[in-house]
């Protein structure tokens, strides 16, 4: 390097390493309506001050790096840098803090969840100065939301397509999830739909394996759909899983489903990836297909309380990327999910405007500016005794999906579907009559079983089945509501089934 070049490069530049907090911790910053806001749960390494840890997150997820670089002088850092603008201690946890970071909108490509996540949950999660890091929530501003198509159709359009109103929809995942031939698989689909279900579903790991290639499955399932529709007079569907090893193959399967005239297909959005999911959502809107989303792999990312990404963030990302249904946990079944936390992200999926509510884990007010809503799917270890609780918790705009709770009926698949449909209709009627499902749920199911032998048999089989494990991911003590009665809703439902 010549002396002249060295002198010019050194003007206004001091090489070396300086604390992140000198540039990226700005407690006086007033957030803008166009900022993307993030709440991170930060656990610093011993000796690292919380302000430095929060600033490091802001820096490493936006414009910063580990040392000063002279090219900083070629742009406006004040315009593009992320800012840690508030830090609060987590009560009841040692050395754990919530760091709030604001990102300028220009840091992100329009309509790309992939780019959004690459920055905000990228390399910063491996930063050595942090023992653990978790993204608890995001505020997506209207200016950015408007760059996304979102769900292909949304809740109201789905109801209109299916001509089903005033109750939750009923589904069933076909079991065993792997190993059936296409013809036997289609037979199970037909029996469940004929028995009264609205949907059946491919399991998430059913793609195109040697025992059942995708094209054969699609054909036999389409036959089952049309036969059950003709016999019941109701519109039926099966979630045909279009997830594949390449986007081209995925879209080929979606095209074949459209040619068969089926109403809905399916995608595993986390294992398949956000780019593939957004592409499929666009195809579904253009071609009149509903899109069911499975969240396989989510617990790897969201289950641990101190590291990863909370599912409420993954739910928001899905609403941006596109999907008409997404699995959301059950509260009362076999899968992880605390009631208040689950209800929080269910509202974020369905509602147009959701206020900040820390008692449900919602850190920011979210305005979706009329982006279509997503139907939550309750699935995993549920059966007829859960029906009152599920109806109460999830309301009408939901899908209640019973796999083993349908196919495990002692009399077969169709009677299992009948039992679930009768239980649902009884709960909806009781609710509409003003009865308290929380207090009278078990009695409602018992009374309905007197005139439905299928339901009575199901009640007998599953009367002792419960999944009583405390959830791993819970609200922080300072975020919990003070309740007069600490009994959970599930406890009320499981009092006496005699």
Swiss-Prot record:
Q: What molecular function terms (GO) are annotated for this protein? A: magnesium ion binding; monooxygenase activity; ribulose-bisphosphate carboxylase activity
Show the propeptide residue ranges: 1-2
Q: Where is the signal peptide?
A: none
- Give the EC number(s) listed in the UniProt record: 4.1.1.39
- Lineage of producing organism: Eukaryota, Viridiplantae, Streptophyta, Embryophyta, Tracheophyta
Annotated stretches, region: Disordered = 473-498
Which biological process annotations from GO are given for this protein? photorespiration; reductive pentose-phosphate cycle
Q: Hey, where's the site called Transition state stabilizer on this chain?
A: 334
The answer to whether keyword Metal-binding applies is yes
Q: Which residues are recorded as binding Mg(2+)?
A: 201, 203-204
Q: What is this protein called?
A: Ribulose bisphosphate carboxylase large chain
Q: Coiled-coil segments, which residues? A: none
Q: Which GO terms describe its cellular component?
A: plastid
- The source's domain of life comes to Eukaryota
């Amino acid at each position: 390097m010549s002396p002249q070049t060295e002198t010019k490069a050194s003007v206004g530049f001091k090489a070396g390493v300086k604390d992140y907090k000198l540039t990226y911790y700005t407690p006086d910053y007033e957030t803008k309506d166009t900022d993307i806001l993030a709440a991170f749960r930060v656990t610093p390494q011993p000796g690292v001050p919380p302000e430095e840890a929060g600033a490091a997150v802001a820096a490493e997820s936006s414009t910063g790096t580990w040392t000063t670089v002279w090219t900083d002088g070629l742009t406006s850092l004040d315009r593009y840098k992320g800012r840690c603008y508030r830090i609060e201690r987590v009560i009841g946890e040692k050395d754990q803090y919530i760091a709030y970071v604001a990102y300028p909108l220009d840091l992100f490509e329009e309509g790309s969840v992939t780019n959004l996540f690459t920055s905000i949950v990228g390399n910063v999660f491996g930063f050595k100065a942090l023992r653990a890091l978790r993204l608890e929530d995001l505020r997506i501003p209207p200016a950015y939301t408007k760059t996304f198509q979102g769900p292909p159709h949304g809740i109201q359009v789905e109801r209109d397509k299916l001509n089903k109103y005033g109750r939750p929809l009923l589904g069933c995942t076909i079991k065993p999830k792997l190993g059936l031939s296409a013809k036997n698989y289609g037979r199970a689909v037909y029996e469940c739909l004929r028995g009264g279900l609205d949907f059946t579903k491919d399991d998430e790991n059913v793609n195109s394996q040697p025992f059942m290639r995708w094209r054969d499955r699609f054909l036999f399932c389409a036959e089952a759909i049309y036969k059950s529709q003709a016999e019941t007079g109701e519109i039926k569907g099966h979630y045909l899983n279009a997830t594949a090893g390449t986007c081209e193959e995925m879209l080929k399967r979606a095209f074949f489903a459209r040619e068969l005239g089926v109403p809905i297909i399916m995608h595993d959005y986390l294992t398949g990836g956000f780019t593939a999911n957004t592409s499929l959502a666009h195809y579904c809107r253009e071609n009149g297909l509903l899109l069911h989303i499975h969240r396989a792999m989510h617990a790897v990312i969201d289950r641990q309380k101190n590291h990863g990404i909370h599912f409420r963030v993954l739910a928001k990302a899905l609403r941006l990327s596109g999907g008409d249904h997404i699995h959301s946990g059950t509260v009362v079944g076999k899968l992880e999910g605390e009631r208040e936390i689950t209800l929080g992200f269910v509202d974020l999926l369905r509602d147009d405007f959701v206020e900040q509510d820390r008692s449900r884990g919602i850190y920011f007010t979210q305005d979706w500016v009329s982006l279509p809503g997503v139907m939550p799917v309750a699935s995993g270890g549920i059966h007829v005794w859960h029906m009152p609780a599920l109806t109460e918790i999830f309301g009408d705009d939901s899908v209640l999906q019973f796999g083993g709770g349908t196919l495990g009926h002692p009399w077969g698949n169709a009677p299992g579907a009948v039992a679930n449909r009768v239980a649902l209709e009884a709960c909806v009627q009781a609710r509409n009559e003003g009865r308290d499902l929380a207090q009278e749920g078990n009695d409602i199911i018992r009374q309905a079983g007197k005139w439905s032998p299928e339901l009575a048999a199901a009640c007998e089989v599953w009367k002792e089945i419960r999944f009583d494990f405390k959830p791993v991911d819970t609200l922080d003590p300072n975020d919990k509501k003070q309740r007069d009665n600490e009994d959970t809703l599930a406890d009320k439902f499981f009092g006496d089934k005699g």
